[in-house]
Amino acid sequence: MAVDKAWLRPGMKVAVVSCPALGDTTLFLRLAWRLHAAGAQVTLVSAPLYPAREYLPDLEVVGDARPDIVQLAGQHDLVICYIDWLILASRAGVDLLPLSNVAYLAGKKLPRQFRLEQRSVTVAGQVLAHAHSVICRDPKAGKTMVQWIDLYAQEVLGLDPAVPIPGLKALPPVAADADRRLAIFPTTPHASKNYSSRGFRRLARELVARGWQVEFVGTPAEQASLQRQYPDYTVNAFSDLKGLIDFLRSCSVVVSNDSGGGHLGSLMGLRTFTITRRRPDFTWRPGFNAFNSVIHPRFTFKWMGETVWRPFIPLSRIWDALSKVSQ
């Protein structure tokens, strides 16, 4: 798909409006970095990233929990916005559709009622074809969401994927013993995605026996409950994303369910293992580096309408892989 890149002039103002979910936030951050690398002056609207803005000096990070899309559209040449903000505005009686310089991105599906495929996005009088889009255009293609957001940047915005992006900067130094420290994120916002606490305890015991220092990570609201489930281990909880980023600088490996912790770890260059019932090439696996593995069940079966998968997770794949890294 050939794209005329003439729309993007050096210094052009672009706002990228993310959503609260950590995994999605990492994708919008990557898109913001790509736009900055192409010469745009980028404002990233993200409440989760605002406390960590000192690590994002190349972007203007705004922490609005409920962004004013109308105001952003008036202040920027282009706004790329997570679809939920359009939905929420519509429910509140605010019509954002006349804003012709706002492009909406959804994960896998654009809501039909807005008929976005019939609306053009224009920047300085130039039409950006297909700017309203889903990030993942084909969930069976085997691509990660990182690869999909890069394709959007390349095919819709005309950005060169070979241009290096800035990444996080001015981070705390990596801990001296990080190569033997591992963080487990045992929960997600969706209980059906969570691996069993018994399985995580077994994994932690095996890793400790092999010389790893294992700690767990949850939200502040989960911390007390998780500490009861994992009494032999430190359970960390952080009030903001900066605290979590600082903690992960003390680790080299993240084990998680299908959750934001794995995406953040991957973004930071850590080795990740994602425990999920889904197939190994599922779209939402971490994909920011080459050291991401999906641990999925050897088989599953249905019982009383539920998929049984947790007993069949091959945890040995994790400690075997880490043993090879240590050699």
Regions found by a protein language model. Give the residues of each.
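Catalytic machinery of carbohydrate-active enzymes
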Residues: M1-Q327
